[in-house]
Amino acid sequence: VIVVAAAAGGVGGLVTQLALARGATVIGIAGPSNAEYLRSLGAIPVSYGEGLEQRIREAAPSPVTAFVDCFGGYASLAHSLGVPGERVGTLVPTPAIALRRARFTGGRDGKIADIATVAGLIDRGTVSLTIAGTYPFELEQVRAAYSELMSGHVRGKIVITIP
């Protein structure tokens, strides 16, 4: 069982789909408004907030063995669930992550082969990319896109179109 924090976001949604494509059971942490979306992907939705650890334990059909934090701040939760540091990945490095020996899994040094693999999964319909909104490359529109992003409740990716 893999837990994905921010599972309905752009990166979290892809992580969720990739894990499911590899046969994992995924518990996705997201807001209540995204529960049906996560179910449609094949994940088990769990709402964030008070009592999160207990809700994850109740939803998990077997012990949690990995944790991917696409939001930041969930290192202690992963630890409380018994996930070893080397089985925790995050996009947001913090001192707590370093202390628990978790992996920082972001960066610009992707591999061409990884891109080809994901592109193949998208072509076959195994993975889909959710677009939260599309904005033209104009100052006010870019500001609007940024405001939407900073709201913290974007499902999928925001696209800026350049003519």
Regions found by a protein language model. Name each.
Residues 1-163:
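Terminal helix/beta-alpha structural elements that buttress the NAD(P)+-binding lobe
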